[in-house]
């Protein structure tokens, strides 16, 4: 993904303020609620029977935290997303058999969560830069599928 210096500054500047644990839990939780078919990849997580069950589920929160920490590695390596996510791409493709479309969905949900957390600070240029990043990460995670 090609980002201008200004776009990189938008992303890294805001990312420094992101509470990865909180935002990760909310983004993954929202994904599982809004797109319930994604729950099939999380059978071992226990009760996902309602929105409140999903949002309060400790395993959802823990995995969301893990996802956002990985995304943070991507933000730190914006010029090498494919390399940064190569092992995760392999894991999700070969072992977990996750539909790569889910990476795009999660990226879009993440942008919504960031917008809700940061309000006016999440300006149109910041949103546009984050959309590029989440699209680049989704492509990097889907790389092994091609």
Swiss-Prot record:
Transmembrane segments: none annotated. GO terms for biological process: hydrogen peroxide catabolic process. Involved in oxygen transport from the lung to the various peripheral tissues. This is Hemoglobin subunit beta. Belongs to the globin family. The gene is HBB. The modification Phosphothreonine is found at residue 12. The keyword Heme applies. The modification Phosphoserine is found at residue 44. Heme b binds at residues 63, 92. Residues 2-146 form the Globin domain. Red blood cells. It comes from Suncus murinus (Asian house shrew). One of its GO terms (molecular function) is haptoglobin binding. It comes from the Eukaryota. GO terms for cellular component: blood microparticle; haptoglobin-hemoglobin complex; hemoglobin complex. The modification N-acetylvaline is found at residue 1. PANTHER family: HEMOGLOBIN FAMILY MEMBER (PTHR11442), HEMOGLOBIN SUBUNIT BETA (PTHR11442:SF42). Keywords: Acetylation, Heme, Iron, Metal-binding, Oxygen transport, Phosphoprotein, S-nitrosylation, Transport.
